[in-house]
Amino acid sequence: MDEVAVDLKQALPNVYNNLQVHVDVHQKSNSPATSQDIQSHVMQLLNRHCVVFGDYSWTEFDDSFLMKNIHSISIADTELKLKDRQPIDLSKCKVLIHIFQLNEDGPCVESLEEENEDLVAANHWLLPAADFHGLWDSLIYDSEIKSRLLDYIETAMLFSDKNVDSNLISWNRVVLLHGPPGTGKTSLCKALAQKLTIRLSYRYRYGQLVEINSHSLFSKWFSESGKLVTKMFQKIHELINDKEALVFVLIDEVESLTAARKASRAGTEPSDAIRVVNAVLTQIDHIKRYPNVVILSTSNLTEKIDVAFTDRADIKQYIGPPSPAAIFKIYLSCIEELMKCQIIYPKQQLLTLRDLEIIGFLENNISKLSLQLNEISRKSEGLSGRVLRKLPFLAHALYLQSPTVTIERFLWALSLAVDEQFQERKNFSENI
């Protein structure tokens, strides 16, 4: 332990310890290094940095072995437990190191043949995938949504490993995320699959994510749809039979299944439709018995989800629009990225919302820009996360058009872009 760490530890009496700290180690794709060697060098690095503040990443290393073999080392998700960035004494924590390499291939398309026509039934990724790298950190929520989902899946895996009798204690490994469009439900499902593949790499060699296109499962000839469902799940069964794989089945817009079921009951769709939906539910019931499968689902229309499906979900999590506090964090992450890329220049340190709370939102030369960002965040309330992440681009495209801008000019443009977004909404609703 170096002298700086000792001094810091003494100066901060409320250092957290006895935590479970996850360290994600991104190994380069061409690295031949063994996990044992990597773990040894990572522990040496962590021992030199005994006290850290919340989540932290290293991308440059003094150690030539790490420079040659590792992209990044990240202390991850501590703030999910501590809420705010806090000093953590790593020497008194249980440190779990997760080493992973990203699959660069992108998604494969799973097709089903119907009437001599190929239908895109699903997209299929090998995890961890480069497509989803960084996605987990980009998703910002007010409540403990991410922590709750991680804890749920890890508990489900524990119960399966310990052979808990599911007739006595019931769990299905089925998650339903519901809420308005644009709130990141599908992205959260993909990010969760990626994160869990990394977290559980000690027992599963890799992950598989199958994103089912719900609409493709319903043929225009309903009598054929049952065959499509069977074919789709036969392919999923092949993946599940590989015990070294952790398989995630993502059913997006699950209300499209239940809508067909209700329409059939009302007599507006053929009775074959209800058999198709029942076939899907039966297949879900069958694959959930396997310990290495997790079923993730999303819905934009909560009121249209059939009780037959919701009863199968262990967690029914509402994902709503972000609050001003979450919006502030989203904007702050965007600004930090633009500073890193030197589109916003010179780089300036902005205070976090927690910092502003500590000083009572007092305006001075240090807090002025952060307070301005806070005001922009407040007037952005009601916009979805999808829209919020577009606004920095629109601010630059519509009001700046310069290779480099100051933070002051950028905040001015961002404020105008927010106003423009609400005006567009108003104009659109008036013309409907």
UniProtKB/Swiss-Prot annotation:
Pfam families (UniProt xref): AAA, AAA_lid_TRIP13_C, TRIP13_N
Keywords assigned by UniProt, alphabetized: ATP-binding, Differentiation, Meiosis, Nucleotide-binding, Oogenesis, Spermatogenesis
Signal peptide per UniProt: none
Keyword Repressor applies: no
GO molecular function: ATP binding; ATP hydrolysis activity
Binding site for ATP: 179-186
Superkingdom as given in the UniProt entry: Eukaryota
SUPFAM superfamilies per UniProt: P-loop containing nucleoside triphosphate hydrolases
GO biological process: double-strand break repair; oogenesis; reciprocal meiotic recombination; spermatogenesis; synaptonemal complex assembly
Family listed: Belongs to the AAA ATPase family. PCH2 subfamily.
Known function: Plays a key role in chromosome recombination and chromosome structure development during meiosis. Required at early steps in meiotic recombination that leads to non-crossovers pathways. Also needed for efficient completion of homologous synapsis by influencing crossover distribution along the chromosomes affecting both crossovers and non-crossovers pathways.
PANTHER family: PACHYTENE CHECKPOINT PROTEIN 2 (PTHR45991), PACHYTENE CHECKPOINT PROTEIN 2 HOMOLOG (PTHR45991:SF1)
Protein name: Pachytene checkpoint protein 2 homolog
Lineage: Eukaryota, Metazoa, Chordata, Craniata, Vertebrata
